């Protein structure tokens, strides 16, 4: 039976790499897929990974009906044995509903990839809807690490290396350009303390010490 599968995780856990691997494995067996993406770091109409791999994709626009787009593709003689939706957290809730309809009405597997929460630890609407509708939610097993070495569970937005907790939910940044808007994965402890790798280096911090209560 076709499924809607949501592969989730923090940044740096290999979501886009897995999406590209699924595309490679299926195309090697003669299957053809439709790849949707939104706001990829490599630019419009691209699916890329941090390992440098990249392929062409369909850039999703605001208000675009993904089900109708796929039906139009098929009606014009196109083929789609599966659908990949990368950066799915940026999709609107109704677009996630449309992907579910692709599975149910067209009998086509849909593989969605995305991060679950934003830099404030709030669910992205697209990710929330995927959790609600997906036949399976797979948490990727490649663990991203916080600067302290602990498992990273939260995504932080930084400006000049300083963590910020206010601003628009979606701002495309770069993990390699610390002087602009960037992103970093942190463990919960250091996300709560707003302690990025840059701020930790600047303060030359020793291991965390619990506060001493005087009484």
Residue ranges and their predicted role:
Residues 1-74, 118-129, 142, 170-173, ...:
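Conserved P-loop
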Residues 4-6, 32-34, 81-84, 109-111:
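Residue-level preference for the first positions of well-ordered beta-strands
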Residues 86-88:
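Walker B catalytic acidic pair
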Residues 90-92, 119-120:
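Catalytic P-loop NTPase motifs of RecA-like helicase/translocase cores
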Residues 134:
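Short basic (Lys/Arg) and small-residue
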Residues 142-175:
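Short recognition patches in nucleic-acid-associated and regulatory proteins
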């Amino acid at each position: 039976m076709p499924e809607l599968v949501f592969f989730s995780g923090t940044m740096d856990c290999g979501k886009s790499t897995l999406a590209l691997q699924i595309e490679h494995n299926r195309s090697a067996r003669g299957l053809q897929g439709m790849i949707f993406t939104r706001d990829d770091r490599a630019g419009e109409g691209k699916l890329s990974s941090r390992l440098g791999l990249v392929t062409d994709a369909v850039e999703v626009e605001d208000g675009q009906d993904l089900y109708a787009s796929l039906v139009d593709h098929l009606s014009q003689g196109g083929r789609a044995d599966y659908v990949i939706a990368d950066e799915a957290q940026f999709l609107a809730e109704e677009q996630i509903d449309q992907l579910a309809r692709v599975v149910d009405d067209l009998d086509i597997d849909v593989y969605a990839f995305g991060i679950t929460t934003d830099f404030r630890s709030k669910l992205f609407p697209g990710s929330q809807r995927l959790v609600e509708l997906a036949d399976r939610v797979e948490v990727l097993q490649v663990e991203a690490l916080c600067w302290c070495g602990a498992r990273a569970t939260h995504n932080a937005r930084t400006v000049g290396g300083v963590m910020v907790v206010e601003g628009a939910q979606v701002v495309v940044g770069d993990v390699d350009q610390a002087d602009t808007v960037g992103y970093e994965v942190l463990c919960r402890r250091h996300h709560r303390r707003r302690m990025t790798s840059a701020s930790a280096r600047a303060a030359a911090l020793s291991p965390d010490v619990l506060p001493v209560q005087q009484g």
